[in-house]
């Protein structure tokens, strides 16, 4: 089993992801379905240039590689990334003192940032910043600079910023060992209280909150070789430049330098907190090699079980997940809803599109009773909606679902994969808007899937036939007539299709049965047809043994 380890707000280094064998994925040729194809790894490989041989750069006390104090403008990080990509990849060597390098999880948690030392705390600004110490999984030295009036000032490590509890017996170092990341605070929920808004820590991972949310899914700067048998490559944000916010602004801007053996990149994040926190991302990639297995705007989440399929799960909680579905608005004007699954074997699905309008991992179930978890509160986890800026052309929204037996593992990944590889030596620009929160997508006059459940079709005796129940919620007035229901499958036999009003949900319930026959993987598609125009989600599902 391959998964991403979750340690509360922590994300792992790339060493926790190992090579994996792909399960066979079903390829649909019928235009009646959103296309789900086999992973590219199972197709004839396109020759690519091997990454330049990496060299090692030893540590230098108090060395500042990227965030040197000096003039800074909007093009500074782009120039750095371009220069970085023109040279072979360098494995940076910044070893920690032995005591910090071998910290346990509890020991690492015992090193806390002192809120009194928060950046801008004494200036009355709408944002504050706190840094994370290095140690545990977070061995990489991350440089940070503060930008004000086009001047960048390197933020050196200071042991006085941190407090160490009883678990830590040694003194913190005095050398500039850098940081492992940082978090931004804002009066997101209550005036006068600076709550966490956003975190950057671990590889290129980051995550954010809308009003009233608790941390759940994460985003990354870039995905490379996800679900590749040779192993995934994890780029890292090596340095950040954080612009000092204005007194009267609801905006904070973060610049980041990305690096990995295959690519360097420059990122700009414009963050606006709110009920749904909005982050505008502008990125420029400088590939060292051809990027044929690249994912733009990647998100990482967790799905353990729900009414959709529990796989004999022995758990008092009805549902356990950070996200319960992948929502897509494609270039043809369709709205597609694909419930997530915790499969028995690795599944990779590719939904082909041209000029996508939006996609994201959504936590649609907001009722505490559906989770019954007094600590995790999965009903508070944010959804993340990605809106491409400009025409992203041809490609596919790729969904990877990894088997897991524990909620501590992230097992869901989604991203946009361009149809054409990104050439080595090129400059590739793209931009998108992220919305983090309970309801990041407008639902005016729409019919959306609110619940998916499945079970044995005959409760009196064992049968391979499956019963599917799909509930739809109607936003707006309910018409007098029932919609027509259309259910299709790539195999097996569909029977007993029934559509009924659901007064409890102000919507409809679609029920049907599937006889798998000799199939072990079947793609399903359901649509509701109304006599008057309205936006209706198309339900997609992959059934497997």
UniProtKB/Swiss-Prot annotation:
Species whose genome carries this gene: Shewanella sp. (strain MR-7)
UniProt-recorded name of the protein: Glucans biosynthesis protein G
Membership in a protein family: Belongs to the OpgD/OpgG family.
Entry keyword Signal: yes
Cleaved signal peptide residues: 1-34
Record keywords: Periplasm, Signal
Pfam families tied to this protein: MdoG
Compartments in which it is found: Periplasm
Gene: opgG
Pathway: Glycan metabolism; osmoregulated periplasmic glucan (OPG) biosynthesis
Function: Involved in the biosynthesis of osmoregulated periplasmic glucans (OPGs).
GO molecular function, one term: carbohydrate binding
Gene Ontology biological process: beta-glucan biosynthetic process
């Amino acid at each position: 089993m391959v998964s991403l380890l979750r340690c509360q707000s922590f994300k792992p280094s790339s060493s926790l992801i190992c090579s994996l064998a792909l399960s066979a994925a079903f390829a649909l040729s019928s235009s009646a379905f959103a296309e789900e194809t086999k992973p590219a790894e199972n197709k004839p490989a396109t020759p690519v240039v091997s990454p330049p041989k990496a060299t090692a750069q030893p540590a230098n006390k108090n060395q500042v590689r990227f965030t040197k104090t000096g003039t800074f403008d909007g093009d500074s990080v782009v120039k750095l990334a371009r220069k970085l990509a023109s040279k072979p990849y360098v494995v940076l060597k910044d070893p920690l003192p032995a005591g910090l390098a071998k910290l346990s999880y509890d020991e690492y948690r015992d090193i806390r940032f002192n809120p009194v030392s928060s950046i801008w705390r004494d200036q009355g600004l709408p944002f504050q910043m706190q840094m994370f110490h290095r140690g545990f999984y977070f061995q990489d030295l991350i440089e940070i600079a503060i930008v004000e009036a086009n001047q960048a000032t390197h933020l050196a490590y200071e042991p006085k910023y941190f407090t160490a509890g009883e678990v830590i017996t040694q003194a913190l170092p005095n050398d500039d060992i850098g940081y492992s990341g940082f978090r931004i605070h804002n009066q997101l929920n209550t005036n006068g209280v600076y709550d966490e808004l956003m975190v950057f820590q671990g590889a290129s991972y980051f995550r954010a909150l809308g009003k009233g949310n608790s941390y759940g899914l994460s985003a990354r700067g870039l995905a490379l070789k996800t679900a590749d048998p040779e192993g995934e490559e994890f780029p890292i944000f090596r340095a950040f430049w954080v612009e000092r916010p204005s007194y009267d602004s609801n905006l904070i801007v973060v610049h980041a330098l990305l690096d990995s053996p295959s690519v360097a990149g420059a990122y700009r994040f414009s963050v606006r907190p709110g009920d749904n926190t909005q982050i505008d991302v502008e990125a420029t990639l400088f590939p060292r090699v051809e990027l044929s297995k690249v994912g733009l705007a990647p998100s990482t989440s967790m799905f353990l079980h729900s009414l959709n399929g529990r796989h004999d799960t022995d758990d008092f909680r009805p549902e356990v997940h950070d996200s319960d579905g992948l929502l897509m608005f494609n270039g043809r004007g369709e709205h597609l809803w694909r419930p997530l699954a915790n499969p028995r074997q690795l599944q990779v699905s590719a939904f082909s599109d041209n000029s996508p309008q939006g996609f994201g991992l959504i936590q649609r179930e907001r009722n505490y009773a559906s989770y019954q978890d007094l600590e995790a509160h999965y009903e508070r986890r944010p959804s993340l909606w990605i809106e491409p800026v400009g025409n992203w052309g041809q490609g596919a929204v790729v969904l990877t679902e990894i088997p897991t037996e524990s909620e501590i593992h992230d097992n869901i990944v989604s991203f946009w994969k361009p149809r054409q590889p990104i050439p080595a030596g090129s400059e590739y620009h793209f931009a998108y808007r992220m919305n983090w929160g309970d309801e990041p997508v407008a639902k005016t006059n729409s019919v959306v899937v609110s619940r998916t459940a499945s079970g044995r079709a005959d409760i009196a005796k064992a049968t391979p036939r499956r019963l599917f129940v799909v509930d739809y919620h109607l936003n707006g007035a309910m018409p007098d007539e029932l919609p027509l229901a259309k259910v299709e499958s790539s195999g097996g036999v569909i029977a007993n299709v029934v559509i009924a009003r659901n007064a409890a949900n102000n919507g409809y319930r679609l029920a049907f049965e599937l006889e798998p026959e000799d199939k072990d993987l079947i793609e399903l598609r359901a649509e509701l047809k109304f006599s008057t125009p309205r936006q209706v989600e198309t339900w997609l599902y992959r059934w497997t043994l």
